[in-house]
């Protein structure tokens, strides 16, 4: 097992929210089958407000050893972004932004929508094929 651990290769990769959404739409990105409970709507709204406020997003981790990537860490954030971009959640009772940001993604000014979907994010992509047990161990380490 130590030999396997030493041979793991996580490659840092920069994305935008738009690129992440495109991977999802193309079914090139999926959540891990056993995930933690997804955030409630209030927590999703706070996260989206943080992104709109320019607060940097924590790194994402992906298993990219196969053409269809699996999210190892960040599925809750990806879920919140997807729901917001597809107008499934509406921002309200904002703490950091003015009332003009209340509402759905489609309600934003085009310049604000562009800025949101072009928000840079950093991901670490595992490029080494690993046994399922080791992937589960990595997942637990990232999420504990």
Task: List the predicted regions and their residue ranges.
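Glycine-rich phosphate-binding segment of PLP-dependent enzymes
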Residues: 21-29
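Basic- and aromatic-enriched surface patches that contact anionic nucleotides/nucleic acids
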Residues: 2-13, 17-18, 31-144
């Amino acid at each position: 097992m130590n030999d396997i651990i030493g041979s793991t290769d996580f490659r840092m990769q920069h994305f935008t929210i738009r690129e992440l959404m495109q991977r999802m739409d193309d079914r090139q990105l999926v959540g891990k089958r056993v995930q933690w409970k997804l955030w409630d709507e209030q927590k999703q709204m706070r996260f989206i407000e943080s992104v709109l406020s320019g607060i940097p997003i924590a790194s994402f981790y992906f298993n990219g050893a196969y053409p269809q990537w699996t999210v190892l860490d960040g599925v809750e954030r990806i879920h919140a972004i997807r729901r917001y971009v597809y107008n499934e959640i509406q921002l309200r009772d904002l703490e950091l932004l003015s009332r003009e940001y209340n509402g759905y993604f489609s309600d934003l000014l085009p310049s604000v929508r562009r800025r949101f979907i072009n928000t840079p994010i950093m991901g670490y992509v595992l490029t080494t094929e690993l046994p399922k047990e080791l992937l589960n161990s990595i997942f637990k380490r990232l999420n504990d």
